[in-house]
C-alpha cells in the first residue's frame, strides 16, 4: 500500500493558512511561496502531503486495497505522522572557532582592528509557543483528509543540532494507527511472547501501513560574533561585534547580553558523586553576578538593530563592580563568560526570534592593591595656578618612603617619532608646568591612604593628562651601607625642575634603600603588562643605607614588585582662554 501513494513536503515561507481554509481548499498550499533554506535554532512548520495514485475516489487503477473510495477513506482517517530532525550533509563545521585570534584580550594598540577574537556558538534555540504551565511544547495537529490526499501539518525544532551543522535531514514517519487487541491490553506483549511464538504475535502487524519520507535542507548559521576585551582606568570593557555574514536577508538584533558561565567552574563528577570547584574561577557564590555586565548606551544602540548582508554593529559592555576586592576574595579571579544574542529575520514564519549562546574569552580580575588616583577642577584658564590632588591607596604592603616625581621629558623615551610628531609632543609637554616636581610623601603603611596636592600652571589651551608623567617611586627594603658619595649640596644656578638636578636628588634619596618607580610609558613586549594600567619598571637602586624613622613591618626582600598590583588612574584637565 505504501508504494501506491505519492509523498510531498512543503516548507512555506509564510505562515500557514488557518486549518479551516486548508480543509475547504486543500490545494491552496501549492500557491504558497517555498523556502530553500532554514536557520539553525528555529522552529519549522511544514506540510506533508500524501496523495493516492490513480484516483482513489474513481475506483480504478488504485490496486488492491486502495482501489475504492471506502478503502482510501478508511486508510486516510487512520494515518498518523511524526517528524524528526538530524544532522545531515557532512560533519558540523567549526562554528566560528577558526576565527579565534591568537592575540590575548586587552593587549596591543586600542585602535587596532585585528584584535577582535572570534567567538564560537555553543547553543542555538528558539522560544517556541509556551503553554499555560510555562513549558515549551510543539503543537500536534490532526491531519486534513480530502478526496484523494491527506495533509499533515507538522512542526520540528532545529535547536538540538550541533553548532555549525551545514544541512538538516528532516524525516517524517507515517503509519496506520491500529486498535490494540484486547489480549495485548490484558496481558501485555511480554506475556504473549512468553506463551506464543514471535511470528504469531506480530504477523498481523506486518501488513500495516508504514512509510518514511526524508529531505535535506541547507542550514544557515547564526550571526558571527567577535569580541574584544580591554581595561581603561581599572574598568573592564568588552566590545561585541555582530556581523551578518551568511544570510542575504536582513536580520534584526533584539537583545544582546553578557553573562558569567557558572557551568565552567565545576570539574567533572568524581567517582563518589561529588563535584569540586575550579580554583580562581568565578562560581555562583563569587563576586560576579548575572547582572554585572551592563550594556552602555550609544547613539545607535536602540533595539531592534537591523543588519543587512555583510553589515555589522558594535555593542559596548562594562563590568560593574568594586575596584577593591571584598574581604576574603581570591586574587586573580577568572570569570568565564558567554554572550546571548536574540535575533530574527522576516523569513521566520513561526519562530518569533532565535537565541544563540556564544563562548567569550574569560576575564581575569587582577585588581591592583596599590592605586594612585588624581583629581582637579576642570576647565581652568591659561596662566592660572591650579592644584591636582593625588591620592595613594595602599593595600599592598608597608613602604619606607613614597615619592612623586614629575618627569614629562621621559614621554619620548624609547619612541621613534618623526620630526613633526616630536615637535607636537614637545609643545604639549611644554604647555604644563609643575611648580613642585619633587614630592616626598614619607612612609606608607598597608591599609592607609595618602593625599598630596601638587600645583600646576598651564601656558597653552588644550586637553592635558596630569597623571601620565607623574612618576611613582616606592621604597620597600632597607640595608646598612655607606652613605652615597654624590650627596653634595645643590647649586643655586640649577633649577629644581631640571633633569640633572632631579637625577642627583633621586640618587641622594636612593640612600634610603631599594626603590622601584612606575610610569605610564609604554613598556617593551618582554615586560609584564596589565591592560588599562600600563606601567614600566624604570630603575632599581641597590640598598645603600638604613632608614631613619618609625619602624615598619617589611616583607621578605624582593627584586621587583609585581606590576599587576600597582596601577595609576588618569586625570585630564581642559585649559581654555581667559574670559575677557
UniProtKB/Swiss-Prot annotation:
Q: Does the keyword Cytoplasm apply?
A: yes
Residues modified as Phosphothreonine: 541
Q: Which GO terms describe its cellular component?
A: centriolar satellite; intracellular membrane-bounded organelle; midbody; mitotic spindle; plasma membrane; TRAPPII protein complex
- Signal peptide limits: none
Asked if the record carries the keyword ATP-binding, the reply is: no
Pfam families named in the record: TRAPP14_C (PF23652), TRAPP14_N (PF15806)
| Gene Ontology BP terms | cilium assembly; regulation of cell population proliferation
Q: What is this protein called?
A: Trafficking protein particle complex subunit 14
What's its job? Specific subunit of the TRAPP (transport protein particle) II complex, a highly conserved vesicle tethering complex that functions in late Golgi trafficking as a membrane tether. TRAPP II complex also has GEF activity toward RAB1A. TRAPPC14 is dispensable for TRAPPII complex integrity but mediates RAB3IP preciliary vesicle trafficking to the mother centriole during ciliogenesis. Modulates YAP1 activity as transcriptional regulator.
Any one GO molecular-function label of the UniProt entry: alpha-tubulin binding
How this chain assembles, per its entry, is: Component of the multisubunit TRAPP II complex, which includes at least TRAPPC1, TRAPPC2, TRAPPC2L, TRAPPC3, TRAPPC4, TRAPPC5, TRAPPC6A/B, TRAPPC9, TRAPPC10 and TRAPPC14. TRAPPC9, TRAPPC10 and TRAPPC14 are specific subunits of the TRAPP II complex. Interacts with alpha-tubulin during mitosis. Interacts with RAB3IP (via the N-terminal region); this interaction mediates RAB3IP association with the TRAPP II complex. Interacts with TRAPPC10. Interacts with FBF1.
Subcellular localization, as worded in the UniProt entry: Cytoplasm, Cytoskeleton, Spindle; Vesicle; Midbody; Cytoplasm
Q: Which disease is it linked to?
A: Microcephaly 25, primary, autosomal recessive: A form of microcephaly, a disease defined as a head circumference more than 3 standard deviations below the age, sex and ethnically matched mean. Brain weight is markedly reduced and the cerebral cortex is disproportionately small. MCPH25 patients additionally manifest global developmental delay, severe intellectual disability with speech impairment, attention deficit-hyperactivity disorder, and reduced white matter and thin corpus callosum on brain imaging.
Q: Where is the composition biased (Low complexity)?
A: 124-137, 492-502
Q: In which tissues is it expressed?
A: Broadly expressed. High levels in brain, cerebellum, testis and whole blood.
Q: Where is the composition biased (Polar residues)?
A: 512-525
Q: Which UniProt keywords apply?
A: Cilium biogenesis/degradation, Cytoplasm, Cytoskeleton, Disease variant, Phosphoprotein, Primary microcephaly
> Compositional bias (Gly residues) spans?
105-116
In this chain, where does the modification Phosphoserine occur? 491, 517, 546
Outline the segment boundaries, as ranges, of region: Disordered. 90-138, 480-533
Amino acid at each position: 500500500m505504501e508504494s501506491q501513494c505519492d509523498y510531498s513536503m512543503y516548507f512555506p515561507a509564510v505562515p500557514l493558512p488557518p486549518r479551516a481554509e486548508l480543509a475547504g481548499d486543500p490545494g491552496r498550499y501549492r500557491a504558497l511561496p517555498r523556502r530553500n533554506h532554514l536557520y539553525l535554532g528555529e522552529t519549522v512548520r511544514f506540510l506533508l502531503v500524501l496523495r493516492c495514485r490513480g484516483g482513489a475516489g474513481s475506483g480504478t487503477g488504485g490496486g488492491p486495497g486502495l482501489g475504492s473510495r471506502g478503502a482510501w477513506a478508511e486508510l486516510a482517517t487512520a494515518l498518523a505522522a511524526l517528524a524528526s530532525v538530524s544532522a545531515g550533509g557532512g560533519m558540523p563545521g567549526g562554528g566560528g572557532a577558526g576565527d579565534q585570534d591568537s592575540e590575548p584580550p586587552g593587549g596591543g594598540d586600542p585602535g587596532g582592528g585585528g584584535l577582535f577574537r572570534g567567538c564560537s556558538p555553543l547553543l542555538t534555540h528558539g522560544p517556541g509557543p509556551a503553554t499555560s504551565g510555562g513549558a515549551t511544547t510543539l503543537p500536534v495537529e490532526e491531519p486534513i483528509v480530502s478526496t484523494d490526499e491527506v495533509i499533515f501539518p507538522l512542526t520540528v525544532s532545529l535547536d538540538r543540532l550541533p553548532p555549525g551543522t551545514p544541512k538538516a535531514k528532516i524525516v517524517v514517519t507515517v503509519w496506520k494507527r491500529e486498535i490494540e487487541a484486547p489480549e495485548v491490553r490484558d496481558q501485555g506483549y511480554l506475556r504473549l511472547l512468553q506463551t506464543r511464538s514471535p511470528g504469531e504475535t506480530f504477523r498481523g502487524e506486518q501488513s500495516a501501513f508504514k512509510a518514511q519520507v526524508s529531505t535535506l535542507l541547507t542550514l544557515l548559521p547564526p550571526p558571527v560574533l567577535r569580541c574584544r576585551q580591554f581595561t581603561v582606568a581599572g574598568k573592564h570593557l568588552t566590545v561585541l561585534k555582530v556581523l551578518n555574514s551568511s544570510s542575504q536577508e536582513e536580520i534584526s538584533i533584539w537583545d544582546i547580553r553578557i553573562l558569567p558561565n557558572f557551568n565552567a567552574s565545576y570539574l567533572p563528577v568524581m567517582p563518589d558523586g561529588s563535584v569540586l570547584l575550579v580554583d580562581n574561577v568565578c562560581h555562583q557564590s563569587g563576586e560576579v553576578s548575572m547582572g554585572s555586565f551592563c550594556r552602555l548606551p550609544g547613539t545607535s544602540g536602540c533595539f531592534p538593530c537591523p543588519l543587512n548582508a555583510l553589515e555589522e554593529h558594535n555593542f559596548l559592555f562594562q563590568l560593574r563592580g568594586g575596584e577593591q576586592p571584598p574581604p576574603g576574595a581570591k586574587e586573580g579571579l577568572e570569570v568565564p563568560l558567554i554572550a546571548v544574542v536574540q535575533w530574527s529575520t522576516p523569513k521566520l514564519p513561526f519562530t518569533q526570534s532565535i537565541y544563540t549562546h556564544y563562548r567569550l574569552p574569560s576575564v581575569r580580575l587582577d585588581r591592583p592593591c596599590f592605586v594612585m588616583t588624581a583629581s582637579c577642577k576642570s576647565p581652568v584658564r591659561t596662566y592660572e595656578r591650579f592644584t591636582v590632588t593625588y591620592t595613594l591607596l595602599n593595600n599592598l604592603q608597608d613602604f619606607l618612603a613614597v615619592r612623586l616625581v614629575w618627569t614629562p621629558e621621559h614621554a619620548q623615551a624609547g619612541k621613534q617619532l618623526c620630526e613633526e610628531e616630536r615637535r607636537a609632543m614637545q609643545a604639549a609637554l611644554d604647555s604644563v608646568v609643575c611648580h613642585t616636581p619633587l614630592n616626598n610623601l614619607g612612609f606608607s603603611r598597608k591599609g592607609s591612604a595618602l593625599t598630596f596636592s601638587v600645583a600646576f600652571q598651564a601656558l597653552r589651551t588644550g586637553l592635558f593628562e596630569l597623571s601620565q608623567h607623574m612618576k611613582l617611586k616606592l621604597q620597600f627594603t632597607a640595608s646598612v651601607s655607606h652613605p652615597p658619595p654624590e650627596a653634595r649640596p645643590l647649586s643655586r644656578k640649577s633649577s629644581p625642575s631640571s633633569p640633572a638636578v632631579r637625577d642627583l636628588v633621586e640618587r641622594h634619596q636612593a640612600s634610603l634603600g631599594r626603590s622601584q618607580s612606575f610610569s605610564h610609558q609604554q613598556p617593551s613586549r618582554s615586560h609584564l603588562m596589565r591592560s588599562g594600567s600600563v606601567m614600566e619598571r624604570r630603575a632599581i637602586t641597590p640598598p645603600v643605607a638604613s632608614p631613619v624613622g618609625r619602624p615598619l613591618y617589611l616583607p621578605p626582600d624582593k627584586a621587583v614588585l609585581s606590576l599587576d598590583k600597582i596601577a595609576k588612574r588618569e586625570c585630564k584637565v581642559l585649559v581654555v582662554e581667559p574670559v575677557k
